[in-house]
Amino acid sequence: MSDFKEVSINRAANVYFDGKVTSRTITFADGSFKTLGIMQAGDYNFGTNEAELMEITAGDCEILLAGETEWQTIIGGQSFNVDANSSFDIKAKTIIDYCCTYIS
């Protein structure tokens, strides 16, 4: 889905890693929310509170989920899931455009 209807958008950016990763939170009428963001090339580690679906809409990266030993290559149009109360490492090879869905 490339368009979201009937949402509210928080104008304040979520800023991580000295501005190298930024996102905006969108909230749906049912109270669910997602973040839409941009990640500059680099290596990052993210922790999760809730389970997440990370959709890479553009770009090229490698990810390593907590507890795994094999890096996975993810390109634009692909996605991956992260468990709640977990973490993942990501190596953004190019600028990454992403959509993160929080699963409760």
Where are the language model's segments positioned?
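A short, N-terminal "cap"/entry segment at the start of jelly-roll beta-barrel domains
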Residues: M1-S32
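Conserved short histidine dyad/triad with adjacent acidic residue
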Residues: T27-N49, N81-A84
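Short, conserved beta-strand element in jelly-roll/cupin
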Residues: T48-I63
